[in-house]
A protein has these predicted regions:
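Helix-loop-helix junctions that connect adjacent transmembrane helices in secondary transporters/permeases
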Residues: 131-216, 382-458, 645-664
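Phosphate/diphosphate-binding loops
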Residues: 100-101, 256-303, 521-546
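Flexible, low-hydrophobicity surface segments
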Residues: 1-140
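Glycine-rich loop/linker segments at domain edges
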Residues: 2-3, 69-77, 141-186, 276-361, ...
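Extended active-site and interfacial segments that coordinate phosphate-rich ligands
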Residues: 22, 110-123, 203, 214-215, ...
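C-terminal catalytic domains of large/alpha subunits in multi-subunit enzymes
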Residues: 55, 218-225, 253-258, 287, ...
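Short acidic, glycine/serine/threonine-rich loops at helix termini
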Residues: 61-67, 108-111, 209-211, 235-241, ...
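Thiamine diphosphate
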Residues: 229-255, 259-262, 269, 476-480
Length: 721
């Protein structure tokens, strides 16, 4: 730890003297028709060079959402770069001020005037689904994608069978903000070749280039280069392009370098959030055996006004509600809904926390109705030979029984401790949750990397494995080191070129815990090809000079495609080749008088395949658990003004996260993972919140099904004496 990393805001200090600093003129309403934009007063402000509107955008002025499914009713071209006809959400940008300083730019942005015709604001999915709601995007219904899942037999007979116990409940997971410390920042310029170069916190460089190029009116890769800044945590919000296109518009319009930095209020109000899910789940289990025989689901994804990746996110409900259990018969319907609240962006877990919260809380309700211990019910029903996932896929490993065995003594000790330490004033409880998540984007996802032997015998690895705090450089280097073992190359002789589309191939976005599996395998393939090219027929390996003398290629391109199959009709398929598995146990204390909950300990049994770097992996799991505590108890972005600061949005403080976080690893090698590894980042946020909610119920009898579990909710849910 040196503190020498230069982040995007630091770069402004070193940019050329003619650099323009940008500020956005943004809407302060959530839904309106734009009748006019008056920039005249702003243009007269000190230091202002240009004030840009949609009229200055050279291309389509749209960011494509890259529609994933043919039955999506939208076309994906619904998000403006600079809004021209309508305001779709609070904070939409209508103009860019380009000035000689950030202070001058911000002062002028406040002088831009909008003539708006206000429209009804639909701030939740139920409001946007109402019969009298107008279309947010005229021509596209507010409900624009509707997946349906069918697995096994019709479920109705199982719910009608008197030999089965039935439980059902309704759930809500909130619009969780990412609460990264570093606000969004980026800059751009025209290079010596006349290409537009954009530096940002992007975690999907090639993806974002394809999304913004048509809107800017440039061709990729001929006229556009994307480079990732040194980046702290993004937790997924940068899976969506945020300011990249805005910077591009300004550079192309002015011909000068441009720098844009959000303050924290803008970070909250003008970047994406976790999409809320409204979910209903029913389960039926045999009274005598406790085996789950059927499940019915209904889920609604409130994805805000912009459709990008909304269909894929909604599909996660089909894939992960009830995941981890061998449920033979499933029926369910989901829907993606456009609203006027914050646009839906990827967030760690990407549909997993939303989908597994309802089924994991319902598992506790089912256990109570069956008269079983929640641990025993989960252990009985977890994946075993012959079971399949909700999408009908055979799990790649059968590791859950081993994980339950590892947790059992911890669970029994925790129950005894809670019973012994509970008082009339402070009740203590223990809660469990099982979580499963896929490592990758759906279906035959792929990634590319290259390996090159250098004259000094070192090897350079090139990839676009974007780093947003998870340790991509270490992951790339460690994977390459393992693959290059035959030539005995020490790790210090492995160099990295990363995250510049003019130099590195399309490795795909760093999201969905895909990079270790996908890009790790691409690096492995490139390195193995290089090793084979260096191998002498009679043993040993060629040097660089010998390779060049014999005309052997010192550069090898590697590509790897996942052996997976997209979910097709009825959401059945094999969407991931590698999964991650987690068992979570929460120990909580609840103040009976106030409903305030304190998490005293979290235990996680994790199976993420072979651990590549224990220090990094520990950090990933600890961080995800901390975010899960926030998701359970405090975090939200519902009130646009109240929740626009870190404290207002409920970020957990050091007092809210227990020092006692215990990690237990079960390392089951993955057949398709690089050297047996799977992903890591998503799984620690898929299960803490239901475990905490179940622990609250175990402590005081308060069942909270709509997150976050604020003290007043817990207090209201406590049984009345």
């Amino acid at each position: 730890m040196t503190g020498l990393a230069e982040y995007g805001a630091d770069a402004a200090v070193h940019m050329p003297p003619d650099t323009l600093h940008l500020a956005l003129a943004q809407a302060k309403v959530s839904h309106a028709i734009i009748k006019g934009i008056d920039t005249s007063e702003a243009e007269k402000m000190p230091g202002v060079v240009r004030v840009l509107t949609h009229k200055d955008v050279k291309g389509k002025n749209r960011i494509t959402g890259l529609i994933n499914f043919a039955d999506n009713k939208g076309d994906g071209w619904d998000r403006p770069i600079l809004n021209d006809t309508k305001v779709f959400q609070y904070g939409d940008a209508l103009a860019i001020v380009c000035a000689d300083s950030e202070a001058h730019a911000r002062a002028a942005a406040d002088k831009v005037k909008f003539d708006l015709e206000l429209l009804p604001e639909y701030m939740s999915a139920p409001e946007a689904m109402a019969p009298d709601a107008i279309e947010i995007h005229p021509g596209t219904p507010n409900i624009y994608y509707e997946p349906h899942i069918e697995k096994g037999e019709d479920t109705k007979p199982f719910f009608d069978d008197p030999e089965n116990v039935v439980v059902e409940d309704s759930f809500y997971t909130q619009r969780q903000p990412h609460l990264n410390i570093e606000p969004d920042v980026g800059y751009g310029y025209l290079n010596e070749q006349g290409q537009l170069v954009i530096h940002s916190k992007s975690i999907g460089l090639h993806l974002h280039a394809l999304m913004i190029a048509p809107g800017l009116g440039v061709k990729f890769p001929e006229e556009l280069v994307m480079v990732q800044n040194t980046t702290g945590g993004t937790f997924g919000y940068k899976f969506s392009p945020t300011m990249e296109a805005l910077i591009g518009v300004a550079v192309l319009a002015t011909g000068r370098p441009c720098h844009l930095r959000y303050n924290y209020q803008q970070q909250q109000q003008y970047t994406g959030k976790r999409s809320p899910f409204w979910t209903k789940v029913r389960m039926a289990a045999n009274k005598k055996t406790g085996k789950i025989v059927a499940m019915e689901t209904d889920w609604t994804c409130d994805h805000g006004p912009y459709s990008e990746f909304g269909d894929l996110l909604t599909l996660r409900g089909a894939q992960f509600i009830g995941a981890g259990y061998g449920i033979p018969n499933i029926r369910g319907d989901g829907r993606t809904v456009a609203t006027n609240h914050a646009w839906g962006a990827a967030f760690r877990g990407y549909g997993g926390p939303e989908s597994e919260f309802p089924s994991e809380v319902l598992m506790d309700e089912l256990a109570e109705k069956l008269g079983m211990d929640p641990f025993d019910l989960r252990e009985l029903n977890c994946y075993k030979e012959g079971d399949t996932t909700p999408t009908g896929q055979k799990p790649e490993v059968m590791n859950l029984p081993t994980m339950f065995k590892a947790l059992r003594p911890k669970y029994e000790a925790a129950k005894a401790k809670a019973k012994a330490e509970s008082t009339d004033a402070v009740k203590r409880g223990v809660g469990l949750a099982l979580a499963v998540y896929g490592a990758g984007l759906d279906g035959p996802d792929s990634s590319e990397a290259w390996a090159e032997l250098n004259p000094d015998g070192s090897v350079t690895i090139g990839s676009s494995w974007e780093d947003h705090g998870q340790g991509a450089d270490s992951g790339a280097q460690c994977t390459a080191h393992e693959a290059l073992r035959p030539i005995g190359l020490p790790v210090e002789k492995i160099r990295l070129v990363m995250n510049d589309t003019s130099k590195t191939p399309n490795s795909g976005p760093a999201g969905g815990s895909r990079s270790q599996v996908m890009t790790g395998n691409a690096i492995r393939v490139a390195c193995e090809q290089l090793v084979e090219a260096m191998r002498k027929p009679d043993g040993g390996f060629y040097t660089y000079d010998e390779m060049k003398a014999e005309g052997r290629a010192v550069h090898q391109d590697g590509k790897w495609t996942a052996p997976a199959r997209d979910c097709g009709k009825n959401c059945q398929g094999e969407p991931f080749c590698c999964y991650m598995y987690g068992l979570f146990m929460a120990e909580v204390a609840v103040e009976v008088a106030t409903g305030k909950t304190k998490v005293e300990k979290m235990t996680m049994v994790a199976d993420i395949g072979k651990v590549v770097n224990r220090l990094l992996t520990d950090g990933q799991l600890y961080g995800g658990i901390a975010q899960g505590i926030g998701l359970a108890l405090t975090e939200d972005y519902e009130d646009i003004k109240k929740h626009s600061t870190m404290a207002g949005a409920g970020i957990p403080t050091i007092k809210d996260i227990p020092d006692d976080l215990e990690l237990i690893y079960v390392e089951t090698p993955r057949p398709d993972g690089p050297f047996g590894a799977s992903g890591t980042g998503e799984i620690p946020l898929c299960g803490p919140h239901p475990a905490i909610i179940n622990a609250i119920y175990n402590a005081c009898g308060a069942r909270v099904t709509h997150l976050p579990a604020y003290p007043e909710k817990v207090l209201a849910a406590m049984p009345k004496k």
